[in-house]
Amino acid sequence: VKADELLLASIAVPNPKWEKLRRKHLKEHNRCAACDTRRNLEAHHIRPTQWYKELTLDPSNLITLCTKPANHHLFLGHLMDFKSWNPDVVEDAKVWREKIKNRPIWRRF
């Protein structure tokens, strides 16, 4: 089975328990872990459910990432390729959040 087939299968089959957990997670964690936006959020599995099926409904396996405008879901969660995954997504999101929070702001004098 190819990686893209696994991804398609995991997306194509709706799971009522997953949808309930997803909604609860996004209600409790309503900001992107990387940029703090409240818009276009996704509950991302830290460990992919294709290989860690037992973690599909585990709340500790979720992190909130945005899909727009920065798309940290693709950038940090999947390293720019939805066939990939980032085992360091939690740590990477913290690093990016600090970088964004502490970035220098250009000011006109």
Segment roles from a protein language model:
Residues 4-6, 60-63:
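Intrinsic-disorder/low-complexity peptide segments enriched for small residues
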Residues 40, 62-92:
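Short Cys/His-centered divalent metal-binding micro-motifs
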Residues 47-62:
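Short linker/helix segments within small regulatory modules
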